[in-house]
């Protein structure tokens, strides 16, 4: 059992017969009345967020979670398939439990969060920065970059982001998965 003084971002606990993760919290001590904690909680199973207020000292059942590195293998009708990097065990997860799946590429690394007591996979965490190849975009024309600007580009994972005009098909770009924005060109397409 934990109480509100133990709250921290990322803490997972059971509340209203479901697993919730603390996204954000704030301890409030008003001039009148008792103290309370205002929280933003994310449902671990389906990802929806709610705002909730707890009385100071309220008890919750904390759940221990573990993060382990896995390799993304492929997606099919049964879900997304992953392999444990240490034991080489494979398993699948339903698409709704896989955050950032539009940035996963076959063979790419991803952290999977497990419930420690039941070994149940709860969610995925893609790296903050990933390198992906541009598979489709309009070609850059000399002189286009004088004014700057962006154009849409489709990446090898299927995601579409805005990239600078000088990016061409075959270029590998680095993007931030949290903001879903282009950061830099990692390598230019070979012109063989």
Swiss-Prot record:
Annotated spans, Disordered: 133-157
Main location: cytoplasm
CDD domains associated with the record: S1_EF-P_repeat_1, S1_EF-P_repeat_2
An example molecular function term from Gene Ontology annotations: translation elongation factor activity
Superkingdom field: Bacteria
GO CC terms in record: cytoplasm
One GO biological process term: peptide biosynthetic process
Keyword Protein biosynthesis: yes
Pfam families: EFP, EFP_N, Elong-fact-P_C
Keywords of this entry: Cytoplasm, Elongation factor, Protein biosynthesis
InterPro entries: Elong-fact-P_C, NA-bd_OB-fold, Rib_uL2_dom2, Transl_elong_fac_P/YeiP, Transl_elong_KOW-like, Transl_elong_P/YeiP_cen, Transl_elong_P/YeiP_CS, Transl_elongation_fac_P
Pathway where it operates: Protein biosynthesis; polypeptide chain elongation
Subcellular location as annotated: Cytoplasm
Function, in words: Involved in peptide bond synthesis. Stimulates efficient translation and peptide-bond synthesis on native or reconstituted 70S ribosomes in vitro. Probably functions indirectly by altering the affinity of the ribosome for aminoacyl-tRNA, thus increasing their reactivity as acceptors for peptidyl transferase.
HAMAP family: EF_P (MF_00141)
NCBIfam families: efp, PRK00529.1
UniProt record similarity statement: Belongs to the elongation factor P family.
Name of the protein described by the UniProt record: Elongation factor P
Organism: Salinibacter ruber (strain DSM 13855 / M31)
């Amino acid at each position: 059992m934990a109480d509100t003084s133990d709250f921290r971002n990322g803490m997972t606990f059971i509340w209203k017969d479901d697993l919730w993760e603390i996204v954000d919290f704030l301890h409030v001590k008003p001039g009148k009345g008792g103290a309370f904690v205002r929280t933003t909680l994310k449902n671990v199973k389906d990802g929806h967020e709610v705002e909730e207020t707890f009385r100071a000292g309220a008890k919750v059942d904390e759940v221990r979670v573990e993060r382990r590195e896995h390799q993304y293998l492929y997606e099919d009708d049964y879900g997304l398939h992953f392999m444990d990097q240490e034991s080489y065990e494979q398993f699948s997860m339903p698409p709704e439990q896989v955050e950032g799946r539009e940035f996963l590429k076959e063979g790419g690394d991803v952290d999977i969060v497990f419930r420690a007591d039941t070994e149940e996979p709860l969610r995925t965490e893609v790296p903050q920065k990933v390198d992906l190849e541009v598979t489709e975009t309009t070609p850059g024309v000399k002189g286009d970059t004088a004014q700057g600007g962006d154009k849409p580009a489709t990446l090898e994972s299927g995601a579409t982001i805005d990239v600078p005009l000088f990016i061409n098909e075959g270029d590998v770009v680095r993007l931030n998965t949290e903001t879903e924005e282009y950061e830099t060109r990692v390598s230019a397409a070979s012109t063989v």
